[in-house]
């Protein structure tokens, strides 16, 4: 039976909608994540229940079942460079996405201290640099604690938030083509429940802090990364991001996009 909700571990380098495209292709071709689910459906359709025999009727039934690609959607976008947990609604499960997107989330982020980029992550161009000198793990940990609570922070100019019906990232890319930078961005209230400094190390004239964040829905980790830098008097950007939990759903229960 096809599940209504699928937990996927998104790999780096693919958009969130790209994950949907891969899943639709897997369903259509009756392979990958959907292989076991479609096996039962095709046996029922062909009358070969429990035989394990692949006949022309079974193959035809597989093609017939796979033609009926259900509607799919996801509960919360992950940027192309980010990895981790995505909740995919399938068929009737898409009706649950509106509520699922409101769930709290946990992330593990690597924050590069000493540079700021146009996009707030490594996709963008460096626009500010500062050599990191004498910064300690204790100073970073203390600054992180000050982020707990509600913070009014600017969102990334490359976020999916719409302004006058147009996603911010489309405005930013259009400005980039003209050699300009979007400086007027919306400010959002972001909720941070927990922070934990997992690791701190120097990397040349930069520093990298690995941080676990437990946050409310609508909180942008790129914004928190840049704000951490400001509180340390350094520019900062997001180096890597992995979503590990959405509500009670955990990355350890997620499936891989094994054919991507």
Regions found by a protein language model. Give the residues of each.
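Catalytic/RNA-binding core of pseudouridine synthases
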Residues: 1-260
């Amino acid at each position: 039976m096809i599940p209504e909700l699928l937990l996927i571990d998104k790999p780096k380098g693919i958009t969130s909608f790209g994950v949907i495209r891969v899943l639709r292709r897997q369903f259509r071709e009756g392979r990958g994540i959907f292989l076991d689910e479609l096996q039962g459906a095709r046996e029922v359709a062909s009358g070969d229940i429990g035989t394990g025999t692949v006949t022309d009727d079974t193959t035809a039934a597989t093609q017939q079942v796979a033609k009926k690609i259900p509607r799919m959607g996801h509960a919360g976008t992950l940027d192309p460079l980010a990895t981790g947990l995505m909740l995919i609604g399938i068929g009737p499960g898409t009706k649950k996405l509106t509520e699922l997107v409101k769930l709290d989330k946990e992330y593990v982020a690597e924050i590069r201290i000493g540079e700021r980029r146009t996009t707030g992550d490594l996709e963008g161009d460096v626009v500010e640099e500062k050599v990191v000198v004498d910064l300690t793990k204790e100073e970073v940990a203390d600054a992180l604690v000050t982020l707990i609570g509600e913070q009014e922070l600017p969102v990334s100019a490359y976020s999916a938030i719409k302004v006058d019906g147009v996603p911010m990232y489309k405005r930013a890319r259009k400005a980039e083509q003209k050699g300009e930078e979007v400086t007027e961005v919306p400010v959002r209230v972001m909720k941070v429940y927990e922070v934990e400094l997992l690791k701190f190390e120097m990397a040349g004239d930069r520093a990298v802090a690995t941080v676990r964040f437990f946050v409310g829905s609508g909180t942008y980790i790129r914004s928190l990364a840049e704000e951490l830098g400001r509180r340390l008097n350094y520019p900062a950007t997001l180096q890597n991001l992995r979503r590990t939990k959405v509500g009670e759903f955990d990355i350890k229960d997620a499936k891989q996009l094994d054919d991507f």
